[in-house]
Amino acid sequence: GCQRWSLDGLVQEVGRAWDLGIRCVVLFPKVADGLKTEDGAECFNEGGLIPRAIRRLKEVHPGMAIMTDVALDPYSCDGHDGIVSDEGVVLNDETVVLLCKQAVAQARAGADLIGPSDMMDGRVGAIREALDEEGFEHVGIISYTAKYASAYYGPFREALDSAPRAAAG
């Protein structure tokens, strides 16, 4: 099922997972509507929800591997994975820059694995380069290719409350 927890609740739930032998968790944010913008800039706020959650989990459960989601849809007011122009076109290259900033912010907080779930061209190579430039060669990048064709995609969008809205025009 789909669950949302406060930071304290997350720490407790991850502790229960650890006790069951689970050694990796994936974090997805439910961003407050007031923090969502057209460019999704909250995604790379190092004081934001996901970096705070990572740091807290690493303090309390240092052996737990933490995977994070990299995409703009939880942070954008239109629910899209990328920055959208006034003409309704997703701006690939501009979006990739933000995804790199997001991945680096998550790595700085202690993420072990980065999972780009957006659909921007060239983002994996760009994220790898950005992580390496910041000294995070050890942070892995994992693929999401199977999720979109699975029963997990609907609940994922529901959990994030980020179904994309139609472009204007």
Walk through the language-model features, giving the residues of each:
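Alpha/beta enzyme core
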Residues: 1-169
